[in-house]
UniProtKB/Swiss-Prot annotation:
Catalyzes the ATP-dependent 2-thiolation of cytidine in position 32 of tRNA, to form 2-thiocytidine (s(2)C32). The sulfur atoms are provided by the cysteine/cysteine desulfurase (IscS) system. Signal peptide: none annotated. It comes from Azotobacter vinelandii (strain DJ / ATCC BAA-1303). It catalyses: cytidine(32) in tRNA + S-sulfanyl-L-cysteinyl-[cysteine desulfurase] + AH2 + ATP = 2-thiocytidine(32) in tRNA + L-cysteinyl-[cysteine desulfurase] + A + AMP + diphosphate + H(+). This is tRNA-cytidine(32) 2-sulfurtransferase. It is an enzyme of class 2 (transferase).
Amino acid sequence: MGTLSVNQNKLQKRLRRLAGEAVTDFNMIEEGDKVMVCLSGGKDSYTMLDVLLYLQKVAPIGFEIVAVNMDQKQPGFPEEVLPTYLKSIGVDYHIIEKDTYSVVKEKIPEGKTTCSLCSRLRRGTLYTFADRIGATKMALGHHRDDILETFFLNLFYGGTLKAMPPKLLSDDGRNVVIRPLAYCSETDIEAYAKLKEFPIIPCNLCGSQENLQRQVVKEMLREWERQSPGRTEIMFRALQNVHPSQLADRKLFDFAGLRIDDSAAPRFVDAVNL
């Protein structure tokens, strides 16, 4: 890749800045961390690795990066692509070989979406491997749009107000998961992946289509952004500005314990009489 144009340079700086802000805001990476970067071969994980390698060079703390890919034995998976790329940029890496593809095909009827089960099997394997190599953080490539899509999926179909947190502790308590691209837009990531000419591996090798509900939500958000540019950013800010007293979850706010403050009236009268 040659010299960047002005716009390309702005794009690169924006992604690096936003990832750096997310890492700082949520204390994602600390001195001495061993960060296991989960690399699928898609645009998001390539971009995440690229940005984290930059942050590793300029950060005031020292941390280690190791890339990990899981070869799930999908037919046609190009086994040589990731090792070749990672060797070319000098990054330590591991390839986990585990045939979850056969398990998924056995459990899920033909024509049904396999993504959910496939994801759970992959996540469990990665958690175990992170523990084995002593990784203190496990980095996933989810971005701002993924987080918002998950929020609306849970809202529309699950009846819950939750999304993907930028940082979380796994259910088994053994792994801290981080999402350094939490502030980055999918549009920027797509443009950056093309600019950097990452060797993208198709995500549909298994023949499964993305969850239909997620596709609907993704298109809904894109249409909203087309109609009202900046709306996506505003919605994401809402996830960082929650007021439990203005919702209806009794576990988060003590509605039953609300009482009139008897001292409020005298204070109000005193203020008026001043």
